[in-house]
Amino acid sequence: MTLATIPSPPQGVWYLGPIPIRAYAMCIIAGIIVAIWLTRKRYAARGGNPEIVLDAAIVAVPAGIIGGRIYHVITDNQKYFCDTCNPVDAFKITNGGLGIWGAVILGGLAVAVFFRYKKLPLAPFADAVAPAVILAQGIGRLGNWFNQELYGAETTVPWALEIYYRVDENGKFAPVTGTSTGEVMATVHPTFLYELLWNLLIFALLMWADKRFKLGHGRVFALYVAGYTLGRFWIEQMRVDEATLIGGIRINTIVSAVVFAGAIIVFFLLKKGRETPEEVDPTFAASVAADAVASPDGKPLPKAGEGIDGETPSTR
């Protein structure tokens, strides 16, 4: 007997005339907006020009979405390339299906090329964006709730998630795009919620550790990767959705273990301390210093590097 449950949304798609409004896409967009806002504040706090963040996002977001989709299609190819499958579905990104590692790799490469073009160091930006990325991932996981996907085995725990029988306008079974009939097909472990909560925990840890230990030179990003993969490793083993297996083990479990080990090694190999504003962006630091000297009221303006943690270059 299930004492209590978490209901799923009755549907994940609404229509404004002929235009579909998909909750999955809205959650991703919300995560991106929050990530850009937070990264601007954090990058400015390190001495960087916050305007660079939006420019970086313009190249990172589309590259990340493409990379995430490619990774998903490759690692879950059985969903798109089988006797009864339609390969065209591989392009239907609004139906869900983005692999975080593909997004990080291709999005990261796009940002790396952008920063190389700008002749700026990548590490300070990577450290600034890391907590924002994990927070955006948590927000994006809400899209899985609307899509009724990425859940675990059946259970009767008080926080079990109800999976509804959804149908389209023709009465055909449509678990992602349909509307609930009210029939509960199963109560399952809400693994999307477990990952959402884990992501929020890692976000808080990164913000605290960055401020407490003055992390820099890419160490915040390495800590993000290690923290996320640690949680993904055990959550992945709870999921029951179809997945590619290697030696009977889900491929994302293997990837998480390998990447976790690599991130830990990199974290301890990277240089300690944090970059000065002059190291983050010499040109912007010089312009801020010049503005401070030229302040009409005689009061110095905030220096590059004074931001969300209240630091000054002298305290780094």
From Swiss-Prot:
The chain crosses the membrane at residues 18-38, 47-67, 95-115, 188-208, 251-271. A 1,2-diacyl-sn-glycero-3-phospho-(1'-sn-glycerol) binds at residue 141. InterPro entries: Lgt. Keywords: Cell membrane, Membrane, Transferase, Transmembrane, Transmembrane helix. Residues 292-316 are annotated as: Disordered. Its EC number is 2.5.1.145. GO terms for biological process: lipoprotein biosynthetic process. It is found in: Cell membrane. Pathway: Protein modification; lipoprotein biosynthesis (diacylglyceryl transfer). GO terms for molecular function: phosphatidylglycerol-prolipoprotein diacylglyceryl transferase activity. PROSITE patterns: LGT. GO terms for cellular component: plasma membrane. The keyword Transmembrane helix applies. It is a multi-pass membrane protein. This is Phosphatidylglycerol--prolipoprotein diacylglyceryl transferase. It comes from Corynebacterium glutamicum (strain ATCC 13032 / DSM 20300 / JCM 1318 / BCRC 11384 / CCUG 27702 / LMG 3730 / NBRC 12168 / NCIMB 10025 / NRRL B-2784 / 534).
